[in-house]
């Protein structure tokens, strides 16, 4: 099974480096993977960084799985996410931020196992969740800050994030759609460290890039 990880990133090279290293460390390579980065046209720093991935990652093969799409900075980040999603080719689409790191080892195997155990529908239309360390997420809510959709779910819905939401709210909206038709798989064995949101101090002191979003 192939996983398509996609995210937008801008001038956050230390965070992006740590994310990519965490993928390299935790992905089992039993499955296939592609990583698609959305980059702003004026972000020369990140574009140069991506030409030297062999100095960042131990697995040279993973370097060949990383591609980027460059365009003008969008007014609506969700439109950028949808553009990236449309360029993926995997069986499972997984949206991320550049300020997360994977904690769970072999998270791809855990995800496939959950889909096989709980995904009995012939149409394979499913939303798969994940857990993260965000302290500013409402306690007790089942929606994932970083959800996955099967290819069939994404194709049927026609988008990944609703562009009616400029910033916040898209993740909750997506969960509600699939929860309403009982097509949510919890997948809580996949855990991410949301580095810029894992303490209250970080949440109330966003970095320069976050302030511009």
Write out the residue ranges for each language-model feature.
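A short, glycine-/small-residue-rich helix N-cap motif at loop->alpha-helix starts
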Residues: 72-79, 85, 166-168
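Short beta-strand-to-loop element that shapes/binds the nucleotide-sugar donor at the catalytic cleft/hinge
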Residues: 123-145
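Active-site nucleotide-sugar/metal-binding loop of Leloir-type enzymes
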Residues: 82-92
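Short, well-formed alpha-helical segments that are part of the catalytic scaffolds
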Residues: 12-27
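Conserved donor-nucleotide/metal-binding helix-loop-beta segment in metal-dependent transferases, i.e.
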Residues: 105-127
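Short beta-strand-to-loop acidic/aromatic patch adjacent to the donor-nucleotide binding site
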Residues: 90-101
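Acidic donor-binding segment of Leloir-type glycosyltransferases
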Residues: 23-70
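C-terminal catalytic/acceptor-binding lobe
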Residues: 166-213
């Amino acid at each position: 099974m192939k996983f398509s990880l996609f995210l937008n990133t801008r001038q956050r090279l230390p965070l992006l480096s740590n994310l990519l290293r965490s993928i390299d460390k935790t992905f089992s390579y039993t499955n296939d993977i592609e990583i698609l980065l959305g980059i702003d046209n004026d972000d020369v720093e990140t574009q140069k960084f991506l030409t030297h991935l062999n100095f960042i990652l131990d697995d040279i093969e993973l370097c060949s799985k990383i591609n980027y799409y460059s365009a003008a900075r969008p007014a609506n980040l969700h439109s950028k996410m949808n553009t990236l999603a449309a360029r993926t080719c995997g069986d499972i689409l997984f949206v991320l931020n550049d300020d997360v790191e994977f904690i769970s080892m072999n998270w791809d195997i855990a995800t496939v196992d959950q889909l096989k155990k709980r995904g009995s529908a012939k149409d394979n239309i499913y939303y798969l969740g994940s857990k993260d360390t965000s302290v500013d997420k409402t306690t007790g809510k089942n929606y994932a800050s970083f959800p996955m959709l099967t290819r069939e779910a994404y194709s049927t819905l026609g988008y990944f994030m609703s562009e009616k939401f400029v910033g916040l709210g898209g993740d909750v909206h997506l969960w509600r759609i699939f929860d309403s038709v009982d097509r949510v798989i919890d997948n809580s064995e996949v855990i991410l460290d949301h580095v810029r949101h894992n303490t209250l101090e970080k949440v109330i002191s966003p970095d320069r890039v976050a302030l511009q979003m």
